[in-house]
Amino acid sequence: MKYIIKENKMVLEKVNKMNLEELLNCIVCPNIVATQEDVTKAYFCFIHPNTYDNMKRKIENITSLNQHKMLFVTDMEAGAGSAIDGATRFPSMRAACEAGDENLAYLMGKAAAYEARKVGFHWTFGPCVDILGNHFSPMTSIRSASENKDDVLKYTAAYMRGLQDFGLIATLKHFPGDGYTMFDQHLTTSCNPLTKKQWDDSYGYIYQQFIHNGVKVIMAGHISLPAYDEK
């Protein structure tokens, strides 16, 4: 292995006290169609798009039955309206970039966080920090802020700050970087074709800056990165 992650003593002690089912409940995020018993044992719960009232009721019900505090998550990449019927839906991250106003992207994140937290969510799967390197990419398109890494970083970072400043955990996606392939990573393992230097100077730079600036979560995509294999 190229990198070794050091063990945290407190985490290790907690893990050693868990059986397999308890451990899986800490690292797997079930969705709301799972049985109520299974959901209430988990530490995370993904809720599919629904109305404001239905989502709020489900979150309150699961919370009341759970043995511990849970984190509720859904995909609000374009604002809370992406998942919550009746909440504000914003245009794409590309639109935020084309508007040329970093503060607008920040306010998008702020509004998304405010509406999501009112329902009971703690976490969202966004923003998308992919670079549009191939205009025929079926996954990226206008979800990407730009073809330019600096614009991608500028506007998605503003959106992330808006989310996290107002209490909603942000998620960067899709590591190690989509946008250079013509394949849908949900259907096949797509390949990021960049050389090590190209990746370091683009996606590597973007993710490094986000980590330094306090992003909480990074989502891995179904994407290979041959430049960083074991060779």
Question: Which residues does each PLM region occupy?
Answer:
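Enzymes and membrane/adaptor proteins characterized by extended Gly/Ser/Thr/Asp/Glu-rich
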Residues: Q36-Y155, H174, G179-P193, G221-K231
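Short, well-ordered coil/turn segments that N-cap beta-strands
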Residues: L20-C26, Y43, Q67-M70, G120-H122, ...
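Divalent metal-coordination and catalytic microenvironments
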Residues: N19, D75, A116, Y203, ...
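A generic secondary-structure signal
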Residues: K17, N61, E115, G162, ...
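Preference for extracellular/luminal or secreted protein segments
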Residues: M1-A42, P49
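Phosphate/pyrophosphate-binding betaalpha-module
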Residues: L163-L172, Q198, S202-V217
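Short secondary-structure boundary/capping elements
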Residues: K6, N31-A34, M76, M108, ...
